[in-house]
């Protein structure tokens, strides 16, 4: 890993490093459709990772047919919005607009031709060397002279003013650059090597010159080897993203199917009045979430589930972690594998999401022998707990990536984090109040959801630094509570952005 101005130290505001990159593809023209001519193949392998346990992306042909039937234009939607957590390397480049008069024409001439669409990402033949997307904060749109309200109060106020709704204990732990509203936008670079991303960044910086100012960067990467697709605690991630109508044609069993307007503004299912130009854009929530992995592992060891003659101490530790998450590290849900991991189940996308928490031999409202009410995946997607069919309003498209190095031997031995690592959390939704913020505030942070006395989500639940108590983690005694003495996930801040369609950039933001 390169250590430069991107390296991250847990106790300071030095930043993380790993990578992504970009190459110009075509010349701009008057028509968006004709400007984005077919790209000559330059790849022999995808810039995306392929994790067997995650639902496959649709083929170009299938997605195009589905989009046509739903009147979606995948050539106008930025690629990261619908693709999900399949990036190999990714760099988040946060910037402010120093000179809007100079930036706007360059947005049209230098940035827009490089933006990677959904269609392009679906095939190796059309993927660029490095994918590029861009999104703007409310202050960024204001700097560009865009005064239309987008109909989302959380976005309009910015994440820093939303601290209390997220359970953050003030901004003490925040990266200083995220405090206030000084970040106007973010470039997302994605590729399969650091060198590609570094080249792309250098090229874009040269083109934009001093009309923007780099504020902060955070570099992420899929974890190495068999850990690809797993977050730093070790659990397989990205399994439960919904299937968006008009994009996914064959949802996996148990995969939630949501209207396009759950993610995209102005589409079917979006009930808020929006400016016409905002159609097919999406609100991007970015959160830098540090993970205290050695401390988490020590907690599991010290509080392992005890079943003499059934579980070894290590198995008891693994079971506690699985019940806190709601899945084993393989991705197998504890609702289907309640006592021991089942890697074959975890690796099978036709089975690893096919559950509702309903079992004929157990009362849904009281039984926690399989999956605790407080488990992370149950808190954030309650499934049958809220009745059937499942309410799809509060679904989000998650598109984050791990950042920071693997745990060192010294950290593991000391049970203490010395170098920051975590998740660069990204979610897309058409309504932050119904999406990310609802999941965090109303479900994860609510000690009385799904039922009174459940406790907070033991992974992401936050109470502004106050002590967190969780129940149901011991399968032999669901009334037993466990006090979490450490926040194993620490918010380092973030911002709310709007990811516009390509036509919105050319027709509104860049004029």
Task: Identify the role of each PLM range.
Residues 5-21:
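Cleavable N-terminal signal peptides of Sec/SRP-targeted secreted and luminal proteins
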Residues 22-511:
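Long, low-complexity, Ser/Thr/Gly/Pro-rich intrinsically disordered segments that act as flexible linkers
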Residues 1-3:
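N-terminal secretory signal peptides that target proteins for export/translocation
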